[in-house]
C-alpha cells in the first residue's frame, strides 16, 4: 500500500518560513532539523514515485495481457462463427441429401407397388386364360370323342351292341359300387365332421367356462386384495392419528402439570420472601433457607425450559399430524384414481380381445364355408364325370386320356384348396400375433397377465404349422 501524504502542501509553503522563523534567522540545530525533515519528505516522495511507477507498470502489463486476451477471444469468436457457418452449410447439404434419398425411396416404393399390382394383374389374367384354355381343351376333347364314338358306332354296330350289353352290366356294377363307396365315405366323413364339430364346441364351451371362472376368481381376488390394502392403509393412518392424539394429550397434561408446578413454586417463592422479611433476626437460618430457595429456583428454571421444549414438541407433533392427514387424503385419491385406471384398462382390453375373436371367428367361418363349397363342387364334378363316362361308353385309351385331364383339373382344385387352407392358417397366425402384442402392451404398462382375469384363446388349424414369426410366415401344410 502506498504511504500516506502528510502535509505535503503545508511543507511546500513552509520553506520560506519554518516554525515562524526565517531560514537566515535559524540556528544550526534548527537548520539540521529542517534538513532532516526535508530529507525524510524527499525519501517519502521517492517511495511514492517508485510505488506509482510500479503500479503504472502493472496496469500497463495488465492492459497488454487483457488486449492480447481480447484479440484471442475475438479470433476464437471468428473461428466459432466460421465453424458455425460451415456446420450450417454441411447441415443444409445433409438435408438436401436426405431429401433426395427420401424422394428416391418414394419413387422406388411407388415403382414396387406398380410392379406388384402389374404382376398380380398378369398372374390373374394368366390364370383366367389357363382356365379358359383348359375348359376349351376339355370341350374340344369331348367333341372329338363324340365324333370318334359316332364313327366307331357306324363301323362296328354289332360289336358295339354286344359290348354295350357287357359294358352296361359292368358300368351298372361299378356305378353301384361307386355309389356305395360314395355313401360310405360321405357317412364316414359326416360322422367325423359331426364328432369334430361337437368336440370343438364342447372344448370351446369348456374353455369359455374356465376362462370366465378364472376371470371372476381373479377379479374377486384382486378386489379383495385392494380392499385389504385399503383397510391396512386406513388402519395404519388411524393408528398414527390415534398415537399422535395420545401424544398431544400427554404433552398437554405435562404442560398443565408444569404450569401448576410453576404456580406452586411462585407461591412458595412469595411465601419465602415474606418469611425472609419477617425473619430477619435469625440470619443463618434465613441464609440456609435462601440457598434452598435458590436451588428450587434453579429447578423451576429447568422446569420452565422443559415446558418450552414440550410446547415445541407439541407444535411439531401437530404439524406431523396435519402432514399425515394430508398424505392420507392424497393416497386415498391416488388409490381411487389407480383403481379407475385399472378398471378402464381391463374393460378396453376385454373389448379389444372380444372384437378380435369375433373378427377372426367370422373369417375362419367364411374360409371353412368356401372350403366346404369347393369340396362339394369337386364331388359334384366327380359324380357328373362318372355319369358322362358311363353314358359315353369310351374305350380304355380315351378313358385314360380323359381321366388324366380330369386329374389335372382336380390337382388345380386341390391347389386352390391348399391355398385357402394356407390363408386360413395365416389369419389364425395374425390372431395369435395380435394376442401376443396385447400381452406385451400389458406387460409394458406394468399389468401382470395373471391379473387380467381371463386367458385369451389362441386359434389353431389342423394340418398347418403356425410359426413364431410375422403373420405372413406360416408353415406349409403337412
UniProtKB/Swiss-Prot annotation:
Component of the nexin-dynein regulatory complex (N-DRC). Interacts with microtubules. Interacts with SMO. Interacts (via coiled-coil domains) with RAB3B (in GTP-bound form). Interacts with DRC1. Interacts with DRC7. Residues 115-258 are annotated as: Microtubule-binding. Keywords: Cell projection, Cilium, Coiled coil, Cytoplasm, Cytoskeleton, Flagellum, Golgi apparatus, Microtubule. The keyword Aminoacyl-tRNA synthetase does not apply. Highly expressed in adult testes and lung. Weakly or not expressed in other tested tissues. Belongs to the DRC4 family. PANTHER family: DYNEIN REGULATORY COMPLEX SUBUNIT 4 (PTHR31543:SF0). Its main location: cytoplasm. Residues 1-12 have a biased composition (Basic residues). The lineage of its organism: Eukaryota, Metazoa, Chordata, Craniata, Vertebrata. It is found in: Cytoplasm; Cytoplasm, Cytoskeleton; Cell projection, Cilium, Flagellum; Cytoplasm, Cytoskeleton, Cilium axoneme. It comes from Mus musculus. One of its GO terms (molecular function) is microtubule binding. Disruption phenotype: Mice show primary ciliary dyskinesia (PCD) like symptoms including situs inversus and hydrocephalus. Hydrocephalus starts at postnatal day 5 (P5) and becomes more pronounced as the mice mature, eventually leading to mortality between P14-P21. Development of hydrocephalus is associated with severe impairment of cilia motility on ependymal cells lining the ventricles of the brain. The gene is Gas8. This is Dynein regulatory complex subunit 4. It comes from the Eukaryota. Residues 357-478 are annotated as: Interaction with SMO.
Amino acid at each position: 500500500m502506498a504511504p500516506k501524504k502528510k502535509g505535503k502542501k503545508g511543507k511546500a509553503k513552509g520553506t520560506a518560513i519554518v516554525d515562524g522563523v526565517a531560514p537566515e534567522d535559524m540556528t544550526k540545530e534548527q537548520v539540521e532539523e529542517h534538513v532532516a525533515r526535508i530529507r525524510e519528505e524527499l525519501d517519502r516522495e521517492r517511495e511514492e514515485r517508485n510505488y506509482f511507477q510500479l503500479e503504472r507498470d502493472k496496469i500497463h502489463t495488465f492492459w497488454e495481457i487483457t488486449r492480447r486476451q481480447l484479440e484471442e477471444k475475438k479470433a476464437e469468436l471468428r473461428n466459432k462463427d466460421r465453424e458455425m457457418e460451415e456446420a450450417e452449410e454441411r447441415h443444409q447439404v445433409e438435408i438436401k441429401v436426405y431429401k433426395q434419398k427420401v424422394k428416391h425411396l418414394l419413387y422406388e416404393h411407388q415403382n414396387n407397388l406398380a410392379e406388384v399390382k402389374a404382376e398380380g394383374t398378369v398372374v390373374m389374367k394368366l390364370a383366367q386364360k389357363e382356365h379358359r384354355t383348359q375348359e376349351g381343351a376339355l370341350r374340344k376333347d369331348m367333341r372329338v370323342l363324340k365324333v370318334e364314338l359316332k364313327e366307331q358306332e357306324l363301323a362296328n354296330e354289332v360289336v358295339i351292341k354286344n359290348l354295350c350289353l357287357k359294358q352296361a352290366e359292368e358300368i351298372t356294377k361299378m356305378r353301384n359300387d361307386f355309389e356305395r363307396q360314395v355313401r360310405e365315405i360321405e357317412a364316414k366323413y359326416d360322422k367325423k365332421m359331426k364328432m369334430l364339430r361337437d368336440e370343438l364346441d364342447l372344448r370351446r364351451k369348456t374353455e369359455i367356462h374356465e376362462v370366465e371362472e378364472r376371470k371372476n376368481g381373479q377379479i374377486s381376488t384382486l378386489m379383495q386384495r385392494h380392499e385389504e390394502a385399503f383397510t391396512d392403509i386406513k388402519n395404519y393412518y388411524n393408528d398414527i392419528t390415534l398415537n399422535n392424539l395420545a401424544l398431544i394429550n400427554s404433552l398437554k397434561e405435562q404442560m398443565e402439570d408444569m404450569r401448576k408446578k410453576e404456580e406452586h413454586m411462585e407461591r412458595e417463592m412469595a411465601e419465602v420472601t415474606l418469611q425472609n422479611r419477617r425473619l430477619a433476626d435469625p440470619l443463618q437460618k434465613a441464609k440456609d433457607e435462601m440457598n434452598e430457595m435458590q436451588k428450587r429456583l434453579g429447578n423451576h428454571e429447568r422446569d420452565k425450559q422443559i415446558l418450552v421444549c414440550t410446547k415445541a414438541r407439541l407444535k411439531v407433533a401437530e404439524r406431523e399430524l396435519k402432514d399425515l392427514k394430508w398424505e392420507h387424503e392424497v393416497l386415498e385419491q391416488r388409490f381411487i384414481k389407480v383403481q379407475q385406471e385399472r378398471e378402464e384398462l381391463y374393460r378396453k382390453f376385454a373389448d379389444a380381445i372380444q372384437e378380435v375373436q369375433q373378427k377372426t371367428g367370422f373369417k375362419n367361418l367364411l374360409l371353412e364355408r368356401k372350403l366346404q363349397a369347393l369340396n362339394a363342387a369337386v364331388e359334384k364334378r366327380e359324380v357328373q364325370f362318372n355319369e358322362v363316362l358311363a353314358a359315353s361308353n369310351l374305350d380304355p385309351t380315351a378313358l385314360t386320356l380323359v381321366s388324366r385331364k380330369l386329374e389335372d383339373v382336380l390337382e388345380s382344385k386341390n391347389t386352390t384348396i391348399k391355398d385357402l387352407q394356407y390363408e386360413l392358417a395365416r389369419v389364425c397366425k395374425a390372431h395369435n400375433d395380435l394376442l401376443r402384442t396385447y400381452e406385451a402392451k400389458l406387460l409394458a404398462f406394468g399389468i401382470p397377465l395373471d391379473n387380467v382375469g381371463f386367458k385369451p384363446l389362441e386359434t389353431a388349424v389342423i394340418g398347418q404349422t403356425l410359426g413364431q414369426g410375422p403373420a405372413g410366415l406360416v408353415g406349409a401344410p403337412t
